[in-house]
């Protein structure tokens, strides 16, 4: 029975991954979160499920992360900040602790089979995947997610530097929305918006179960069903993202997360 580790089990993508994995009784789930209480509140069906093991702790705790991903077929890096928070480092922090955890596992047993690393990223980072997006829209979206993009780029750089011993795949969907699972396809050529979190998760699991054809590749997930809801709330997020890009201090009043302490500029 294969195990799958989900880092960021309480987030939108993490919750979708857990729901997709629960559809297959032969799959075991290792769910990492900072609050087990919150996870069980969001997904009460996990309580008492013998195929689910919850790992609770700080994202900086290499031992906890190593325990979570040890023996798994794949580890999904789905820890994320949902907006354009200035100074965010959550994606690169997750990449670093994953590398450290895999180093620990390899040090314990040099013959250990390491899991694939399936990384939640964004189509905004790949011009090829965004080739069908109007240029003006592309510029606007990149500005509105500038801090998020910088964090994701650094995360990808960290994992790419370890490609000789860690197999990573970078999942790059377009705009995401909460909706039912309606069908998906994997694409190396283009993104398509909107896409439901559940269809994204199904695509991520498909990559995890594939052979090595997606090693170190940027992979998008596109919807194949019809009637996917348009995320109208994303229009407001674009405005708030632009404010965070040009006037970082506004995030204190508009952001979804506590305002981080930003480094002081020197003269």
Curated annotation (Swiss-Prot):
Annotated pathway: Mycotoxin biosynthesis
Origin: domain of life: Eukaryota
Keyword vocabulary terms for this entry: Monooxygenase, Oxidoreductase
GO function term, MF aspect, one: monooxygenase activity
EC number of this enzyme: 1.-.-.-
Entry annotated with the keyword Oxidoreductase: yes
Keyword Oxidoreductase: yes
Record-linked Gene3D superfamilies: NAD(P)-binding Rossmann-like Domain
Function description: Oxidoreductase; part of the fragmented gene cluster that mediates the biosynthesis of dothistromin (DOTH), a polyketide toxin very similar in structure to the aflatoxin precursor, versicolorin B. The first step of the pathway is the conversion of acetate to norsolorinic acid (NOR) and requires the fatty acid synthase subunits hexA and hexB, as well as the polyketide synthase pksA. PksA combines a hexanoyl starter unit and 7 malonyl-CoA extender units to synthesize the precursor NOR.
Family: Belongs to the avfA family.
Protein name, UniProt field: Oxidoreductase ordB
Species lineage: Eukaryota, Fungi, Dikarya, Ascomycota, Pezizomycotina
């Amino acid at each position: 029975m294969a195990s799958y580790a989900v880092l960021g089990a309480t987030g939108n993508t993490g919750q979708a991954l857990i729901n997709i994995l629960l559809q297959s009784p032969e799959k075991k789930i290792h769910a990492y979160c900072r609050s087990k209480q919150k996870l069980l509140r969001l997904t009460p069906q996990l309580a008492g499920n013998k195929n689910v093991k919850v790992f609770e702790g700080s994202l900086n705790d290499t031992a906890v992360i190593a325990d979570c991903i040890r023996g798994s077929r794949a580890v999904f890096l789905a820890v994320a900040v949902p907006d354009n928070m200035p100074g965010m480092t959550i994606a690169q922090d997750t990449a670093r602790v994953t590398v450290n955890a895999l180093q620990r596992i390899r040090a314990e047993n040099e013959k250990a089979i390491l899991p694939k690393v399936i990384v939640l990223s964004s189509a905004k980072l790949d011009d090829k995947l965004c080739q069908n997006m109007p240029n003006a829209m592309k510029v606007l979206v990149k500005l509105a997610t500038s801090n998020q993009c910088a964090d994701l780029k650094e995360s990808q750089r960290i994992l790419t530097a370890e490609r000789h011993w860690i197999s990573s795949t970078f999942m790059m969907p377009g705009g995401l929305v909460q909706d039912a699972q309606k069908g998906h396809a994997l694409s190396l050529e283009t993104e398509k918006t909107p896409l439901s979190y559940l269809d994204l998760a199904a695509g991520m699991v498909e990559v995890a179960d594939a052979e090595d054809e997606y090693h170190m590749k940027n992979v998008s997930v596109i919807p194949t069903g019809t009637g996917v809801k348009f995320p109208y709330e994303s229009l407001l997020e674009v405005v708030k993202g632009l404010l965070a890009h040009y006037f970082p201090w506004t995030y204190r009043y508009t952001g979804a997360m506590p305002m981080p302490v930003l480094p002081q500029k020197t003269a």
